[in-house]
């Protein structure tokens, strides 16, 4: 399993001024890839917005793309000629020698995007990234993403759904610690995002707003093909929570509980299994009048 010394926060202040909650190294990109595999196994549908990527001719942005694993899998599933763009603040994650229809660029969601990108994407996709806004106003980051969508195009946002999780005592402790961590580093902006985002999308004038909630099984509740990956993913995330909270003010979970959490978490999820939820939220920019 992962070693605690390999997962560290790169933030210099503890308030996520650099838009990174956990580390920026191979361990972290591996964790992100495992997270993708767990979510995709439970929910193999890439796009909920009514876009048929198999028709081709679309331009898609995946912001906070990490290794580009979502792009690679969505591109393969589409099986047609589209244009794919992945952005992240950690360029070392990007794949080498991507196909001609795929490009990767450095870009922070808290900074201005290239002016020439505005209004050019049929789909802007962001997954498990918005808590990384830190103390930058969440609404500003979301407005910048919306500005990239072309008239008639779509934005799709995927984040944690913090309620109605089916976990044991250690799982409940882990969930509380993670929520406290995200709350601390984002000034309260990075949790309960569905409730925050829907009014923002409406205020921005977007239409056809809809969402769905997906349940992802872990450990003993997961299928044999993905079980080991779900366990490793949770362990790596728990290590990240345990290590990153060392540089933050105290949270509602004690230091002793945080230090013991990864190993206890692994034992519980192997024996009993857990279920966590995330939401997929999509909305359309109206056609120009």
Where are these regions (language model features)?
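A short glycine-rich, Lys/Arg-flanked "PGG" loop and its adjoining helix->strand segment in the class I
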Residues: 139-154
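A short SAM/SAH-binding and catalytic strip from SAM-dependent methyltransferases
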Residues: 121-139
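Conserved catalytic/acceptor-binding region of the Class I
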Residues: 150, 154-237, 247
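C-terminal lobe and adjacent flexible extensions of AdoMet/dcAdoMet transferase-like proteins
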Residues: 204-207, 214-289
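Class I SAM-dependent methyltransferase SAM/SAH-binding core
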Residues: 57-115, 123
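Class I SAM-dependent methyltransferase Rossmann-like catalytic core
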Residues: 2-57
């Amino acid at each position: 399993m992962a070693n605690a010394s390999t997962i560290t926060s790169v933030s210099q202040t503890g308030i996520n001024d650099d838009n990174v909650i956990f580390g920026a190294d191979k361990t972290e990109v591996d964790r992100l890839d495992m997270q993708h595999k767990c979510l995709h196994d439970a929910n193999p549908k890439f796009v909920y917005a009514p876009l048929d990527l198999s028709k081709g001719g679309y331009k898609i942005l995946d912001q906070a793309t990490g290794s580009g694993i979502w792009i690679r899998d969505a591109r393969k599933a589409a099986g047609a000629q589209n244009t794919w763009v992945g952005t992240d603040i950690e360029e070392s994650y990007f794949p080498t020698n991507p196909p001609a229809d795929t490009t990767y660029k450095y870009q922070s969601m808290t900074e201005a995007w290239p002016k020439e990108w505005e209004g050019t994407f049929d789909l802007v996709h962001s997954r498990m990234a918005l808590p990384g806004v830190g103390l930058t106003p969440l609404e500003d980051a979301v407005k910048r993403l919306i500005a990239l969508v072309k008239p008639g195009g779509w934005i799709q946002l995927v984040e944690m759904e913090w309620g109605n999780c089916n976990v044991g005592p250690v799982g409940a402790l882990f969930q509380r610690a993670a929520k406290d961590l995200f709350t601390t580093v984002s000034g309260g902006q990075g949790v309960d995002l569905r409730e925050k985002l829907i009014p923002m999308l409406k205020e921005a004038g977007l239409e056809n707003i809809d969402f769905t909630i997906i349940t992802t099984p872990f450990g003993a509740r997961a299928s044999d093909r993905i079980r080991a990956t779900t366990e490793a993913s949770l362990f790596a995330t728990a290590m990240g929570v345990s290590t990153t909270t060392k540089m933050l003010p105290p949270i509602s979970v004690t230091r002793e509980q945080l230090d013991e959490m990864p190993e206890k978490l692994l034992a519980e999820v192997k024996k009993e299994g857990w279920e966590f939820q995330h939401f997929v939220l999509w909305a359309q920019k109206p056609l120009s009048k």
